[in-house]
Amino acid sequence: MIQWFLKYRPRSLKDVENQDGAKKELQEWIESWLNGKPNAKAVLLHGPPGVGKTTLAEAVAHDYNLELLEMNASDSRKLQDIKGVAEKASVYGSIFGTRGKLILLDEVDGINVREDTGAIQGILELIEKTKYPIIMTANDPWNPALRELRNKTKMVGLNKLGKYPLRRLLKKICQAEKIICDDEALNYIIDTSEGDTRYAINMLQGIGEGYGKVTLDLVEAMARRKERELDPFETLRDIFWARYAWQAKNAATSAQIDYDMLIRWISENIPIQYDNIEDVWRAFDALSRASIFLKRAKGGDWDLLSYAYDLMSSGVAAAEIEKKKPNWKPKWKKYQFPSYIQLLSKSKDIRDTRDEIIKKLAIHSSFNKTLNDTYPFFLIFYKKYDKRLSLNTKEKEYLNSASKS
């Protein structure tokens, strides 16, 4: 099912509200390109999240019959990826019968200049050599890393959508989707969104589709969850109960725990949440793929981390086939801590005793080297040296037990 903020996004510039100044600047700029005398090779659209930067770029392509070549610069970070966009634009002709092409580089402020060496330089080269107009978007255009880009582009700022236009849009969506929404709830969504149209629509969809109506109590509960990180139990519930990919991924990325621990929590509770063995199989299949992407991401290709999150959240949530039925209702289950954590907790005292012994041994060597190289042999003949090490009763009991196992 499509997300509402995509379903109801403006297709044409005439449908974009509250951005008259930005629309005029973009129209003058794109027409200067089409007339062969561009007043700037690239535009940097900037504004807070959810104000419609990407939508505005897509509307320009639609209205002027331009083929849109889109790339998320913060995901495709490598220099060769950015150069690939230039090659596609310059080498390949349009297969859609359009007047030309428009290059869109989304979220350029998401580029990490330390990890993504050459990315900014690649964009600068693309701007210098481009045969087609380029639109870039950024939430924070004043990021120091973007200084050279600012100098090479025409900057166009976007406003937050005002309360009245946002109210009209939300009411229109409610009518189209046949969702009952209280006026108080609508006001709360508008105030909480602070001009973030995408957030407002997502909140409306999340509650409206889940409960069939939007009330102030439900909206307040959802808003409170957004303002804080979710504990592991809330995270699991939001993932397993999600009917849409974005709901599950939002839960995963809002979790208090990191991705490694989140995978352990999900793995432990999949058999608890899903009764159907095929659902369990599909969920573990998604989770195993997430583990593969996570391992590769840790190897240095951090672009793959997003795929790991997709699979451990949306992939696991989609495993339950019953969710496709309109009358599906989530099942409340009592989740449990990962057995891995329980085992670590139970063995903590034992491990602490072992570590104290190793510290006494590691006089001229590191702790890890002593643990891996010296300690296994020490277990064999420790009784000859226990007095020299001043071992206490607890440590002697541990060594007696460990040497027998």
From Swiss-Prot:
Could you confirm whether the keyword ATP-binding appears in this record? yes
List of residues binding ATP: 47-54
Q: Which domain of life is it from?
A: Archaea
Biological process according to GO: DNA replication
The protein's matches in InterPro entries, at most eight in alphabetical order, are given as: AAA+_ATPase, ATPase_AAA_core, P-loop_NTPase, Rep_factor-C_lsu, RFC_lid
CDD domains, A to Z:
AAA, HLD_clamp_RFC
Can the keyword Membrane be found in this entry's annotation? no
Q: Which Gene3D superfamilies match?
A: 1.10.8.60, P-loop containing nucleotide triphosphate hydrolases (3.40.50.300)
Q: Name one GO molecular function term.
A: ATP hydrolysis activity
- UniProt cross-references to Pfam families, sorted A to Z: AAA (PF00004), RCF1-5-like_lid (PF21960)
Q: Which UniProt keywords apply?
A: ATP-binding, DNA replication, Nucleotide-binding
| SMART domains for this protein | AAA
Q: Which family does it belong to?
A: Belongs to the activator 1 small subunits family. RfcL subfamily.
Q: How does it assemble?
A: Heteromultimer composed of small subunits (RfcS) and large subunits (RfcL).
Q: Which PANTHER family does the entry link to?
A: CHROMOSOME TRANSMISSION FIDELITY FACTOR 18, REPLICATION FACTOR C SUBUNIT 1
The UniProt function text for this chain reads: Part of the RFC clamp loader complex which loads the PCNA sliding clamp onto DNA.
Please report the name of this protein according to its UniProt entry.
Replication factor C large subunit
Native organism is Saccharolobus islandicus (strain Y.N.15.51 / Yellowstone #2) (Sulfolobus islandicus)
